[in-house]
A protein has these predicted regions:
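Conserved N-terminal beta1-alpha1 strand-loop-helix module at the mouth
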Residues: 1-89, 95-103
Length: 104
């Protein structure tokens, strides 16, 4: 239904329980959801990401992780949204991963 929409989260703006809101958004079938909860530690984010991933997967909606590359890896997610500053910081790691993927 919303194939050209990428939803971006902010659980502080949700008027209903956050995971319930994620289900409602997934029901609308967006292209993807970016889990952009910038105030969480990586540990807190990982726990929430796993819960959200279980929901998005059941609706066949792609989940995009924000900033935390290790969380994306743990969940088997290959799309990460981040600032240009962070991208520059992880640049070598990205290049190495692309080279491994493409057998370069």
């Amino acid at each position: 239904m919303l194939n050209d929409v990428i939803a971006v989260t902010n659980r502080k703006l949700s008027q209903r329980p956050f995971l319930e809101q994620i289900k409602r958004v997934c029901h609308l079938r967006p292209e993807a959801i970016i889990l952009r909860e910038k105030d969480l530690s990586e540990t807190e984010y990982a726990k929430l990401a796993e819960e959200v991933y279980n929901i998005t997967t059941s609706y066949d909606v792609r989940l995009i992780i924000h900033t935390y590359i290790n969380v994306a890896r743990e969940l088997g997610i290959n799309t990460v949204h981040m600032s240009l500053h962070n991208m520059r910081e992880y640049r070598k790691e990205f290049i190495d991963n692309v080279n491994k993927t493409n057998n370069i």
